[in-house]
Amino acid sequence: MTFKVIIVGGGPVGLYMAHAFERANIDYVILEQQDTVLNISGQLLFTWPQTVRLFDQIGLLADLENVALGIHHKKRLFGDNGQVTTTSNFWDAMQDNHGYPFLPLLRSELVKILYNHLKGRESNIRVNSRVTDIRPHATGVHVHLADGSLIQGSIVVGADGVHSRTRQIMDSLVAQHALNPARLANKPMVSTFYGIFGRASNVDLGIEPEVFFESRGGGGEGGAVVQCLATKDIVQFVTLKPLPGGPTSERSPRYSDEEMDAYAASLADVAVCPGVKFGDVWAKVQRKSTRMLNQEEGFLDNWFFDRIVLVGDAVHKSTSVNGLGMTCGLHSGAVLANELHSLLSRQREKEEEPSTEELEGAFGRYQEDRKTEVKPIWNGGHAMIREVVKKGWVSWFWDRFVLPWCDMETFAKGLLVSVLLIRQGQILRFVPFEGRGGRVPWARKVVV
């Protein structure tokens, strides 16, 4: 049987991996449980320069630039009174440093572009395909679907998000078969914060366009953070505050409109920018593209077992506060694709299919590489959300007097962020590509 990857999940990470496999000449199928991979999600995804570079490598840059929101400045402010504490041109500085801009993208637009550019979009994507079981065997995997179908392949890549069914099945297999105590089932993801992703009309609000506002510490005793970015017509926003009942590993409920209204009312007096409160924004909200949900956090120990491997939010999930969730997932996908391409290239020379042991070796290298890179980012996001929602004199003193003078984003035009994070971005090693550059050279380049 020709080597075939079964990708579970048709979100940005799953679709990106399909693009990578097409360029690696690896057969694949995407299983998506919804009736379409396209949706109307109003969630805004921050696409960092190193991730824009990944998209440029597969030919998507021009289309993405056409639909991206403009962004040039960042302003932090106190949620209680709207006083601006810091202003920076961080976004423009990063483009100077790396040659690529930050691209704020609606998730729906990104998915549409990934889908439309995929050669196998008609033949290699199965919708309404909910996975119920995965059975690895000596030479491949059997994936059972809720409709009774059986899909056969060589490996399964679980790109099915924070509530990954693939992970649940893998953990069950680990519990049944793993002899190594270190390979016990993963701990569950935990939600400590919840909030609203939404969109509102900016026609009457007059929020300054192309400025990313981050309002900190307002919203009652527990504190909250509100982030927003506007054009002259719309404003995209996200809010986060601690769950009233404390941390939970239960799946996020489907919040009702009444629950969203009550949540919004608790933030009504929080300044989202000078002169505009969250209550003003909520009065102009577009409910069709607005939703409330718990935001899980977790960093798992085990990313693979047998012929099953996990990627993206299925293994490392942060809140949205630092805007790095999708970036981490896509770069994990690039590393996994590189490992599979290298292994299969060697096996093709020998005219042999890779064994389970050889596949686990590739998965292990992928896990080791990405754990080293992602864990510091995850730790930073974990600390950041807890800091920005705080109320009290320590947080006030930090935001008012310390942050303006020792902000990593403004120090030397963001040089620390460029060197420690952005320049380290992954690349598909097997796809010829030169790309753009800036003042800070990329650590990884394609050598073909």
Swiss-Prot record:
Enzyme Commission code(s) on record: 1.-.-.-
Superkingdom as given in the UniProt entry: Eukaryota
Requisite cofactors: FAD
Alphabetical UniProt keywords: FAD, Flavoprotein, Monooxygenase, Oxidoreductase
Keyword Nucleotide-binding tagged: no
Reported induction: Expression is up-regulated during sexual development. Expression is also up-regulated during confrontation with the arthropod fungivore Drosophila melanogaster.
Keyword Oxidoreductase found: yes
Enzyme class: oxidoreductase
Residues at the catalytic site: Q227
Binding site for FAD: E32, R107, D313
Cross-referenced InterPro entries: FAD-bd, FAD/NAD-bd_sf, FAD_mOase_fung
Protein role: Highly reducing polyketide synthase; part of the gene cluster that mediates the biosynthesis of sordarial, a salicylic aldehyde structurally related to the phytotoxin pyriculol. The most interesting aspect of this pathway is formation of an aromatic product from the highly reducing polyketide synthase srdA. SrdA synthesizes a reduced polyketide chain from one molecule of acetyl-CoA and five molecules of malonyl-CoA. The polyketide chain is then reductively released as an aldehyde.
Similarity annotation: Belongs to the paxM FAD-dependent monooxygenase family.
Protein name: FAD-dependent monooxygenase srdH
Annotated gene: srdH
